[in-house]
């Protein structure tokens, strides 16, 4: 496990959420001096790794610096491709959000101040998740249950992701074919 050396935060590691898939663990990082009397905004984060690699623990050091500013961080792991294909990580993010909401009595989370974000593949995943939370037609097409009203999502942070499947191949990003074929199960992933 990657250790975080930050006395200003508390780390609750490897909390199980959901059932039936691997990597269904999340870490929660809170300010060390958090009081249950004051609700704090929450950030849901998903790591990168081209859908085929990566782990939540590698972002905990960075996310701990954000938590010490007065945020509760929920850092979500997800099942990796090629064994688990699209939309498995999105289903898992929805399970993680639902788990945290159902156990909200344990943390002073202000669910009217939600931030959703990720890096690289996690940015792509969370961008699609935010779109599903704010677009009823897309949510219905994907058969997802809405967890947040658009007014509850105060910000989205998409760091280094890709968002337009029709143009991403043209970027010639190294190994994009491997990542996307592993994740979608097809060579024709743009459509």
Predicted regions and their residues:
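Alpha/beta-hydrolase superfamily serine-hydrolase fold, recognizing
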Residues: 1-191
């Amino acid at each position: 496990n990657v250790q975080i050396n930050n006395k200003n935060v508390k780390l609750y590691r490897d909390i199980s959420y959901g059932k039936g898939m691997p990597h269904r663990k999340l870490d929660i990082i809170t300010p060390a001096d958090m009081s249950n009397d004051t609700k704090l905004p929450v950030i849901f984060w998903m790591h990168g790794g081209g859908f085929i690699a990566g782990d939540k623990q590698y972002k905990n050091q960075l996310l701990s610096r954000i938590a010490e500013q007065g945020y509760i961080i929920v850092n979500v792991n997800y099942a990796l491709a090629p064994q688990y294909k699209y939309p498995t990580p999105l289903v898992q993010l929805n399970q993680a959000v639902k788990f945290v909401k159902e156990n909200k009595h344990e943390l002073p989370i202000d669910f009217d101040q939600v931030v959703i974000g990720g890096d690289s593949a996690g940015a792509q995943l969370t961008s699609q998740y935010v779109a599903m939370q704010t677009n009823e037609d897309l949510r219905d097409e994907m058969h997802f249950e809405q967890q947040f009203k658009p007014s509850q999502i105060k910000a989205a942070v998409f760091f280094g992701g890709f968002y337009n499947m029709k143009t991403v191949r043209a970027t010639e990003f190294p190994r994009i074919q491997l990542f996307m074929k592993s994740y979608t199960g097809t060579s024709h992933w743009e459509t």
